[in-house]
From Swiss-Prot:
It is found in: Cytoplasm. Pfam families: Dala_Dala_lig_C, Dala_Dala_lig_N. Belongs to the D-alanine--D-alanine ligase family. This is D-alanine--D-alanine ligase. GO terms for cellular component: cytoplasm.
Length: 324
């Protein structure tokens, strides 16, 4: 019998529509001869299954099921592709743990740690991972322009400590831009990160592990035509994504080994993607860890799967079957 898979998308942040695009990608990638697929759209308390006829059916949150005519359909597995709350921060993982429904990505602790960029980077710093100098501001806290310039320097990035897709991110070059950038970041999250700018080559590397194998993809080099890799660059083509990256075999291996180590340190599961900046002297600096990376047909992970000579359908099967 086919397993019934929920591709869980949507969420409660600005990344709602990005998540739905990832869900369509995943729907196209998963082997439909092995699995019955439904996209489950979540937004606040609205949990709905997209039905083949275009209608939507409410999800019973008591057991994560829905009615298809007179038949009650239960899900065997959840592929979480929500970018942001509640699917990337551990909340939904806790729900599925209580429902005893296996899912595609990291558990509660790893998801919660990685969703908060400051917490994740400070945690990994304790294991010897290089990170940028940074300051954290919580709601209600303030920092003077002088402190930012003295402790972090300019240019710097001011961004939400939570979330992704570069919503609320500003590259700050002048003193006058500091406070408006903080206000903008607080519109997206309750914690704001002030982070030193690092000059170098931006790389991103995906990885997944199952009970019997480790797969580390070829890194991608990110060359943006914008000021930085912002939403416009990510989703409107203002970037060159070069896979595999134009770096030496030795540096490629170091990036891949660091990605694998970060996966293990955090106790990850499923596919992750780690973003880096390589600065002078080939120093590898962590930018952030993504535990529910974008999965549109043009996203980094599908690119890296192709560059590795793998079939994305087989990768999806690995992720699902590893939980049974």
């Amino acid at each position: 019998m086919k397993r019934t898979i929920a591709i869980v998308a949507g969420g409660d942040t600005s990344e709602f529509h990005v998540s739905l695009r990832s869900a369509q990608g995943i729907y196209s990638f998963i082997d439909k001869e092995k699995y019955t697929l439904y996209i489950v759209e979540m937004q606040g308390t609205r949990w709905e299954v997209q039905l083949p006829d275009g209608a939507k059916a409410p999800v019973d949150r008591n057991d994560f099921s829905f009615m298809l005519g007179t038949e009650k359909i239960r899900f065997d597995f959840a592929y979480i592709t929500i970018h942001g709350t509640p699917g990337e921060d551990g909340r939904l993982q806790g729900y599925f743990d209580m429902m005893h429904i296996p899912y595609s990505c990291c558990g509660v602790l790893a998801a919660a740690i990685t969703y908060d960029k400051f917490t994740c980077n400070q945690y990994l710093k304790a294991f010897g991972v290089r990170i940028a100098e940074s300051l954290l501001l919580r709601q209600g806290q303030s920092v003077s322009d002088e402190d930012v310039m003295e402790k972090i320097g300019l240019p710097c990035f001011i961004k939400p400590s939570l979330g992704g897709s570069s919503f609320g991110v500003t590259k700050v070059k002048t003193k006058e831009q500091i406070q408006p950038a903080i206000v903008k970041a607080f519109e997206e999250a309750q914690e704001v990160l002030v982070e030193a700018f690092m000059e170098g080559t931006e790389l991103t590397c995906g990885c997944y592990k199952t009970k019997d194998k480790t797969v580390i993809f070829p890194p991608t080099e990110v060359v943006t035509h914008n000021e930085f890799f912002d939403y416009d660059a990510k989703y409107n083509g203002q970037v060159d994504e070069i896979t595999p990256a134009r770096i030496s075999d030795e540096l490629t291996n170091r990036v891949q080994m660091l990605t694998s180590a970060i996966y293990d340190i955090l106790g990850c599961s499923g596919i992750i993607r780690v973003d880096y900046i390589v600065t002078a002297g080939e120093k590898i600096n962590l930018l952030e860890v993504n535990t529910t990376p974008g999965m549109t047909t043009t996203s980094f992970i599908p690119q890296q799967v192709r560059a590795a000579g793998l079939d994305i359908k087989d990768v999806m099967t690995d992720i699902i079957e590893n939980k049974f």
